[in-house]
Every structure is written in structure tokens, then in C-alpha cells.
């Protein structure tokens, strides 16, 4: 069987609240770590979320 192109990743808040989003990314086209600016409801503002592995 072929290796799947998309993998699940966890986007963890850099505000150290422990809040995270789970999303998918194409591991063949996006080889770098993903980071997005999204809403963190714990601090009630948009912050940077960085990619970590799902444990």
C-alpha cells in the first residue's frame, strides 16, 4: 500500500493556554512546520498556533 499524502497534525497555541486545533496537511507539498494565526478562546484573541505531533 502507498503512504498517505495527508497527515493529521495538532496546532498548539503559543499563548501557553493548552488550547489546540487538529487539522490535516499534505506532507509531500508542505515539508516545513505549519504555523497559523487563529482565535484562542481562552485568552479571547488571535494568537499564533504552531504545529506539534499528535500523541
From Swiss-Prot:
Signal sequence interval, chain numbering: none
Record GO biological process: translation
Molecular function in Gene Ontology: structural constituent of ribosome
A Pfam family per the record: Ribosomal_L33
GO-annotated cellular components: cytosolic large ribosomal subunit
SUPFAM superfamilies reported for this sequence: Zn-binding ribosomal proteins (SSF57829)
InterPro entries found in the cross-reference section: Ribosomal_bL33 (IPR001705), Ribosomal_bL33_CS (IPR018264), Ribosomal_bL33_sf (IPR038584), Ribosomal_zn-bd (IPR011332)
Keywords recorded for this protein, A-Z: Ribonucleoprotein, Ribosomal protein
Protein family (similarity comment): Belongs to the bacterial ribosomal protein bL33 family.
Protein name: Large ribosomal subunit protein bL33
Organism whose genome encodes this protein: Bartonella quintana (strain Toulouse)
Lineage summary: Bacteria, Pseudomonadati, Pseudomonadota, Alphaproteobacteria, Hyphomicrobiales
Gene: rpmG
Amino acid at each position: 500500500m502507498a503512504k498517505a499524502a495527508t497527515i493529521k497534525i495538532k496546532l498548539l497555541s503559543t499563548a501557553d493556554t493548552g488550547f489546540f486545533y487538529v487539522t490535516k496537511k499534505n506532507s509531500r507539498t508542505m515539508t516545513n512546520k505549519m504555523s497559523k494565526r487563529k482565535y484562542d478562546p481562552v485568552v479571547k484573541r488571535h494568537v499564533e498556533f504552531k504545529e506539534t505531533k499528535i500523541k
